[in-house]
Amino acid sequence: MKEMINVVAVGTGGFVGAASRYFISTLVNKLNTSGFPIATLIINILGSFLIGLLTQLLMSLCPDNKKLNLFLTTGILGGFTTFSTFSLETVNLFQGGKAVFGVVNIVLSIAFCLTGVVLGKMLAKTIASM
């Protein structure tokens, strides 16, 4: 029964995260005419920041709440961020003759997503120490 509750927590969070990703992607893609996959980049940077922030806060404030951790990180942020879409869009850029965009997407994604995690963890440590 305990595992089923964990599965429900992850599944519910996954729904929230995936629906949020869809909403943001749709909104950003209506505004983006460049051909660069900015929506996925924004989502992955935001998700990276939030996973750094939330994991650090959860570790500091409620380390024993596994269900909340599963719901927020594995569920919501797992459903929100998307490495597979990043990969597909990058391959499509290369195959579509936009190699420069492909390289830029790789560099920006890695640099900003890692930076997002670090900044999120730093902010969480500051919040937790207040």
Swiss-Prot record:
Membrane in keyword set: yes
Domain of life assignment: Bacteria
Transmembrane found in the keyword field: yes
Pfam families documented for this protein: CRCB
Entry binding sites for Na(+): G78, T81
Any one GO BP annotation for this protein: cellular detoxification of fluoride
GO CC terms in record: plasma membrane
Reaction(s) the record says it catalyses: fluoride(in) = fluoride(out)
Activity regulation (UniProt): Na(+) is not transported, but it plays an essential structural role and its presence is essential for fluoride channel function.
Membrane-spanning residues: 4-24, 35-55, 68-88, 99-119
GO MF term list: fluoride channel activity; metal ion binding
Main location: membrane
Keywords: Cell membrane, Ion channel, Ion transport, Membrane, Metal-binding, Sodium, Transmembrane, Transmembrane helix, Transport
Family listed: Belongs to the fluoride channel Fluc/FEX (TC 1.A.43) family.
Described function: Fluoride-specific ion channel. Important for reducing fluoride concentration in the cell, thus reducing its toxicity.
HAMAP family: FluC
Name used for this protein in its record: Fluoride-specific ion channel FluC
